[in-house]
């Protein structure tokens, strides 16, 4: 496990999402990945579902005239038999066209990363929001 590899993975991963590259961003998940967030009634399973959610988010930001930037910080990582468990704080900054940036959300992101063909991929992601009770 190399912390620089993990940092570079998250930088590329979030730049794809923030840049509107929904399909490429979904490609940084395993084909059978699980993505769970408080805004979802059920976890999304599979790369196709993750891509659909990302496309909807990109379209929503465009309609709102906002740019979002995901800031991944304070990442800890440990190797397990199933891959790498990574826990990060994530702040999402939203900037409306012609306006001032604001903190949109503050979250904790818990990932299980795996290596496939030498590349890190997200196999599982669980997000909790700081403004909502856990559970």
Task: State the predicted function of each range.
Residues 1-19, 23-27:
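Short, low-complexity N-terminal intrinsically disordered segments enriched in polar/charged residues
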Residues 59-135:
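A beta-strand edge to alpha-helix "cap/lid" segment located at domain peripheries
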Residues 22-90:
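A solvent-exposed, acidic/Ser-Thr-rich amphipathic alpha-helical stretch
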Residues 4-8, 48, 104:
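A generic "alpha-helical surface" signal
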């Amino acid at each position: 496990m190399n912390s620089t590899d993990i940092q570079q993975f998250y930088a590329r991963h979030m730049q794809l999402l923030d840049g509107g590259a929904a399909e490429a961003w979904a490609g940084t998940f395993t084909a059978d990945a699980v993505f769970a967030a408080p805004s979802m009634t059920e976890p999304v399973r599979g790369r196709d579902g993750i891509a659909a959610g990302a496309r909807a988010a990109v379209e929503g930001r465009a309609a709102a005239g906002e740019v979002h930037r995901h800031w991944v910080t304070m990442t800890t990582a440990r190797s397990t038999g199933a891959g790498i468990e990574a826990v990060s704080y994530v702040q999402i900054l939203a900037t409306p066209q012609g306006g001032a940036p604001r903190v949109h959300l503050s979250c904790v992101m818990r990932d299980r990363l795996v290596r496939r063909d030498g590349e890190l991929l997200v196999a599982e992601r669980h997000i909790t929001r700081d403004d909502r009770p856990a559970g």
